[in-house]
Regions:
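N-terminal pre-catalytic "stem/leader" segment of glycosyltransferase-like enzymes
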Residues: 1-96
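Extended catalytic core of nucleotide-activated donor transferases of GT-like folds
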Residues: 9, 64-140
Length: 140
C-alpha cells in the first residue's frame, strides 16, 4: 500500500475512533405535522449527539419546516441540519448515511457514495414499496 493510501486509511481510523465521522440521518419534511417515525429519527440523532458522535439531519428541500412546532426547539438547535437541494455533501468513507425504508428510491442515487449506507426499517410494510421494479436491497 502506498504512503498516501496508508495515510488516508490511518486518518479514517482516527476519525472513527474520535467519533468525528458524520452520521447523516435522512428525515422527511412533515410540514409541521407530528409523526412518530420522524421523532424516532430525531431521538436517535439526539442520543448519538449526547454520546459524543456527529449526527446531521438531512432533508430534501431548503424550505424544510422542521419539528420545532411539535417537538420544541431543542431538536432543531441541538442537532445540525443540512439540505441536499442544490448542495454538494461532503461524504467520506468513514461517514454513515441512514435512510428510512420509505426512501428506498434514494438508494439508487446514493449507491456510489463512498460511505456506509444503513436502511432504518421502521415499518416492514414499506420495505419493498419504494424500490424500483426489479431492484432488491442486496443491490445496494
Amino acid at each position: 500500500m502506498g504512503n498516501l493510501a496508508q495515510e488516508k486509511v490511518l486518518q479514517s481510523i482516527k476519525t472513527l475512533r474520535e467519533k468525528k465521522a458524520r452520521i447523516y440521518l435522512f428525515a422527511q419534511d412533515t410540514k409541521g405535522n407530528a409523526k412518530a417515525s420522524v421523532k424516532y429519527i430525531y431521538d436517535v440523532a439526539s442520543t448519538l449527539k449526547k454520546g459524543g458522535f456527529n449526527p446531521i439531519i438531512l432533508h430534501e428541500k431548503n424550505d424544510y419546516a422542521g419539528v420545532e412546532s411539535w417537538l420544541g426547539n431543542e431538536y432543531m438547535n441541538e442537532i445540525p441540519h443540512q439540505s441536499i437541494e442544490g448542495q454538494n455533501l461532503e461524504i467520506s468513507p468513514e461517514d454513515f448515511l441512514i435512510l428510512p425504508e420509505i426512501f428506498g428510491y434514494v438508494m439508487d442515487q446514493v449507491k456510489t457514495l463512498p460511505c456506509a449506507k444503513i436502511v432504518l426499517t421502521q415499518s416492514y410494510a414499506y420495505l419493498l414499496e419504494t424500490l424500483q421494479p426489479g431492484q432488491t436491497w442486496a443491490q445496494f
